[in-house]
Amino acid sequence: MAVTPSLLRLALLLLGAVGRAGPRPQGATVSLSETVQKWREYRHQCQRFLTEAPLLATGLFCNRTFDDYACWPDGPPGSFVNVSCPWYLPWASSVLQGHVYRFCTAEGIWLHKDNSSLPWRDLSECEESKQGERNSPEEQLLSLYIIYTVGYALSFSALVIASAILVSFRHLHCTRNYIHLNLFASFILRALSVFIKDAALKWMYSTAAQQHQWDGLLSYQDSLGCRLVFLLMQYCVAANYYWLLVEGVYLYTLLAFSVFSEQRIFKLYLSIGWGVPLLFVIPWGIVKYLYEDEGCWTRNSNMNYWLIIRLPILFAIGVNFLVFIRVICIVIAKLKANLMCKTDIKCRLAKSTLTLIPLLGTHEVIFAFVMDEHARGTLRFVKLFTELSFTSFQGFMVAVLYCFVNNEVQMEFRKSWERWRLERLNIQRDSSMKPLKCPTSSVSSGATVGSSVYAATCQNSCS
């Protein structure tokens, strides 16, 4: 069934709310939960009307009913019946003069859609006005949704390939790459959690919203599974920030300390990356359950509850920004010590800066202290665009910089290629020499010498 613009808007209302699960600005668009609550009131009024309204005097007629969208009185056969647009719609104020229509057939049965058990309705007058739709917030949210979906899909694919590469080559197994692998895993989990969240929302709208089954939709929102989805997403996002912090701390440790126990420090990094987020995500979930148990926990009305998660993430962003500044200072000092010309210094400094930004998540500093409740209008859209687009593609950039363009990885690929090429040449050489009937001593000695040379060459290239 095709999704109407009105249903699309309802879907995007929630997508916009969960894109950054922060507090809602005052005066923001009505939420899905509020719409469903109004729908329940509308249904209650309709049921009372269906019970109390007098019946038609005599004859054949279509029975009064509530079809989960509008409240319908008894209808005379062979005629159109119209009622005002339901007042629970978020855009009801713009369709006050509109009506929704149904047709009562001559047999006294409401007309159904072709090959369907769903009733036929004409909702055209109750649809949200398309005027200015091009620049509407919903269109902007839809654009952001497409951008971050493409970004997370690309990042997920690149990170899975990069992880397989680092795991496959034994010579790449070291503490540095173990940290990279955990960072890759955090990006992968973040992307998966976003996909699961979006799949849950799409499921809601493909079953309940498209058929105007609002009660079933709210029941899903009130279910434990829905809340666990968003709790999982918050943990994956927090773990991703803290593995970026681990990368920054490890980089600073390499620069500041010449000797340290990598094995011991790696266990500490594991605790920071995967353990610390539990220390504030679980308390946030408990507080939400006890004091703000509304909907899917997609928004935070009380700013103090949201700060339980936001402040530790701001701490991670701040520390990584300080590491970024420190590393840039060290790079400048080393470039000047090499007596390079100013042009070369600027070029290499720019390259180092652009490389460090995605690796440390430095771009988060731009809007780190602009809370969602303070961001409105253009500022809110710019903030959402910057955060969602950069964050979704960040995993791809990390995979490229830490794996695909890494010299060690490229060297391992060259070694594997040379190994494969030499083995293939050796097989071809052996197969071409088999048919020849030469003296046993000369042929066997030549083959043995040739095989030894190839084996030695291969061994040297792998060492």
Swiss-Prot record:
PROSITE patterns: G_PROTEIN_RECEP_F2_1, G_PROTEIN_RECEP_F2_2, G_PROTEIN_RECEP_F2_3, G_PROTEIN_RECEP_F2_4
Region entry Important for allosteric inhibitor binding, spans: 352-355
Disulfide bonds: 46-71, 62-104, 85-126, 226-296
Glycosylation sites: 63, 82, 115
Protein's name in the database: Glucagon-like peptide 1 receptor
Single biological process term from Gene Ontology: adenylate cyclase-activating G protein-coupled receptor signaling pathway
Transmembrane feature ranges: 140-164, 176-201, 228-251, 266-290, 306-328, 349-370, 384-404
Gene Ontology CC annotation, any one: plasma membrane
Taxonomic source organism: Rattus norvegicus (Rat)
Additional record remark: Selective recognition of glucagon-like peptide over glucagon is determined by residues located at the C-terminal end of the glucagon-like peptide.
Lineage: Eukaryota, Metazoa, Chordata, Craniata, Vertebrata
Tissue spec: Pancreatic islets, stomach, lung, rat insulinoma cell line.
